[in-house]
Amino acid sequence: SRFDRGMLLEMDFDAYHPRIIADIIGYELPSNSIHEYFGKQYFGKETISEEEYEASKKITFRLLYGGIDKDFEKVPFFGKTKKYIYNLWNTFKKRGYVVTPFMKRPLYKNCLHDMNPNKLFNYLLQASETEYNLSMINNVNDLLCEYNSELVLYTYDSLLFDFDLKDGKDLILKLQSVMNQAGRFPVKTKAGANYHVMTDMTSRIS
C-alpha cells in the first residue's frame, strides 16, 4: 500500500457469470452459494458432500459454456437459460443482429463468423459482463472521489483497492453495496498487506 496505514482490499463476485445470466433471463438466485443450490438439484439431495459440491461447480460451468444437455433442462435455471439461447439464436438469424441486454449495443451477424447458438450466447455473456463492469466501476470511482483509497486493479470478476485505513469500515460497506447492486451480485471481501497474504473478511464485514 502507498499509505502509511493501508492495506490491499479485494472484492470479488460470487459466481459472476451465472448471476449475470440470472439477471438477463429474470431468474432469482439465492445470495448464498449457487454451487450448493445447483448441486442439490443435480443430485436430488437436501445436503451435498464436498465431492458433490466440487462436481456441481464443474457441471455448472460445463453447461454454461459447452451447452445445456437435455437431462439438465429440468433444472429451472438451465431450462430458462436454454429457452433464452433458443430465442436469441432465432432473433439473430431473422434480424441479422442481437443487442446486449444492458447497454443495447448491436452484435451484427456480418461481424461474427462461424456462429452457433451457444457461441452467440457466450459472446453476449462476455459483452454483458463488460457492460455491467463499466457501469459498476464508474459508480465505484464516483464513490471514491470523497476518500483517499483508490481502485488499482480490475479483473473480470474482482476489484483490488489500495485502501487507506483512515477511510474506515464505512467505505468498505459502501463499496460492497455499490458492487452487489441490492443483492443481485454478492461480493466476497479479502484484505492483506500484499497480494500473497490476503485473508477472507466477508463474514467480519457486514
Region annotations inferred by a language model:
Residues 1-206:
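Conserved catalytic core of nucleotide polymerization and phosphodiester-bond processing enzymes
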